[in-house]
Amino acid sequence: MVAFKFLLALSLSLLVSAAIAQTREPRLTQGQQCRFQRISGAQPSLRIQSEGGTTELWDERQEQFQCAGIVAMRSTIRPNGLSLPNYHPSPRLVYIERGQGLISIMVPGCAETYQVHRSQRTMERTEASEQQDRGSVRDLHQKVHRLRQGDIVAIPSGAAHWCYNDGSEDLVAVSINDVNHLSNQLDQKFRAFYLAGGVPRSGEQEQQARQTFHNIFRAFDAELLSEAFNVPQETIRRMQSEEEERGLIVMARERMTFVRPDEEEGEQEHRGRQLDNGLEETFCTMKFRTNVESRREADIFSRQAGRVHVVDRNKLPILKYMDLSAEKGNLYSNALVSPDWSMTGHTIVYVTRGDAQVQVVDHNGQALMNDRVNQGEMFVVPQYYTSTARAGNNGFEWVAFKTTGSPMRSPLAGYTSVIRAMPLQVITNSYQISPNQAQALKMNRGSQSFLLSPGGRRS
């Protein structure tokens, strides 16, 4: 009995230690190649056409994406389209660029807390016995979340999920997968494990796509799975069929409806029971999404320059396990983002509207980027590299994914800048300028910080 208690205590100790270690060091330690001569805005290089939409991937072999340790993709789901259930070995952060829909992120061990009588749903039945018993059969499932334009969605590694477009327009979702995260112990090649579907055979890049997306049931022995699920082998053969002409996103036979909390209840943050390791929430009750469209809730706001929403581990606590964060920015016509550098991670920028002139400078003083970026393009700003941007005449909007749960930046101009924090004598001697010039360098942006109005006007 004593030995059993000792082993139990040791096991719990190791479990807690592992959890703490993952929270503190959630990223791989092997060196990444961030030695390149050029950064530029990139468009997706691989397009997979499915029955219910398209899946586009940026080239993960590009140096800028290898430096950041991420793989980026964009999914477009047609109305009544279903993105088939799948999981991946690395955490994913998603931005809903357009449309609305439903998503369920299924966490192992969490209760099936939602149920509905099948007679309440419109379903195609193929068995007479099902028609006879339809009033007594219930469908149990985990929580289904509403998606809207502007949502940031966190999907943990290994968590199976599906997405359905119940709206009247295309649902467009842009996401990054952090293949350099500690939870991914395979390698830095992106993989997606599908529970249904398969890659269509048409297309020049079929082979590359087939190496990335797999139906996990297809290679199993049908008799073994039949016994495991306790269902006929014909059912298993249907599960194993990749239905290659349908692809990764399919059209639902009829409009689907699900039991879910009402819209207001879905916005509340449910609290789990207090655990001995100090965590106040469990994965079963954590929020997976938050919205960044509200002007009133912007973290940074300037009447003459724009606004920025930040989504970090404080706003979305699940991000402390994923060590990712995001920001949504809106820069007015000809306004600037202060030159700055990220102290805690790489930044992956996706342009959602407008255009901007972007400059990125490395530690050698080389301009790795001095280009105009446009809607639909993506580029990487490596950690500690200094960058700035000026919006075009039509403004500039972006979403930035960051490989850290606690983003921290160090601006060079403005109220909270490094220059403003220096004594005048340090500035005058560093740049060989007069005290008046040093004072202007420190103070001419007034109370502005990060977002700077065009022409130096104060907001």
UniProtKB/Swiss-Prot annotation:
Annotated source species: Sesamum indicum (Oriental sesame)
Biased composition (Basic and acidic residues): 121-139
Tissue: Expressed in seeds (at protein level). Expressed in seeds.
CDD domains membership: cupin_11S_legumin_C, cupin_11S_legumin_N
GO cellular component, one term: endosperm protein body
Function comment: Seed storage protein.
Signal peptide positions on this chain: 1-21
SMART domains, alphabetized: Cupin_1
UniProt keyword annotations, A-Z: Allergen, Disulfide bond, Seed storage protein, Signal, Storage protein
A GO biological process held by the record: seed maturation
Name of the protein this chain belongs to: 11S globulin seed storage protein 2
SS bonds (residue pairs): 34-67, 110-284
Gene3D superfamilies registered for this protein in UniProt: Jelly Rolls
PROSITE patterns assigned: 11S_SEED_STORAGE
GO MF, any single term: nutrient reservoir activity
Domain Cupin type-1: 37-237, 290-439
Annotated Pfam families: Cupin_1
